[in-house]
Amino acid sequence: MVQRFVAFDVETPNHENNRICSVGVTVIDDGCIVRHFSSLVNPGTYFDAFNMQLCGIRPQDTQHAPGFAALWEEIGPLFCGGAILAAHNAPFDLSVLSKCLAAYRIVTPRTVPYICTCRLARKYRPDFPNHRLDTVCRMLSIPLDHHKAGSDSRACAEVLCALLRDGASIEQNLRRYDLLNGKTLPHKVTL
């Protein structure tokens, strides 16, 4: 049976973190990256100066981009098709995703399995100076154009693959996220 992971990253237009202005998705099957996708997203809301500075995306950049609901038609099956989701600081990205799904009244499975590459790096690479994505990528010689969703999702996928090759355990680190209520559930998940 193929073990599939969907590494993803979102960028948000403002501090409310309830809309997405860019998304990156990288699919891993049996340790190999098999698909990579990124897109700007028209968030239908305002941008604040901090977030524009952080990710470099401005309102005019997303003016003709698809809205979240239209984009979800394309990427939703990847997220809800039984794959394990992966993100660096996964609770943040999952929280934003949960809020977007609720805002657009998109029905999904209530819970999804996920793994956080930041937690994995802390556990399996305690020797790193810190476990921010840019630092982990530098230490593992993984290319990164930070705060660009496409680059961040691909880097997350490569970090996950590297940590798994080095012996990280999925079973011991798998969690489940409640998309309906926007929170990590308290118990570990078994495969």
Predicted regions and their residues:
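Acidic two-metal-ion nuclease catalytic site recognized across multiple nuclease folds
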Residues: 1, 159-191
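Conserved non-catalytic scaffold segment of RNase H-like nuclease domains
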Residues: 1-112, 126-147, 187-188
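Short, glycine/acidic-enriched loop or turn micro-motifs at the edges of active sites
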Residues: 12-14, 119, 155
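Buried hydrophobic packing segments
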Residues: 97, 120, 156-160
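Beta-strand segments within the central parallel beta-sheet cores of soluble alpha/beta enzyme folds
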Residues: 113-116, 174-176
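Short, flexible loop segments at boundaries between secondary-structure elements
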Residues: 115-126
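Acidic, divalent-metal-coordinating active-site segment for phosphoryl/phosphodiester hydrolysis
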Residues: 148-162
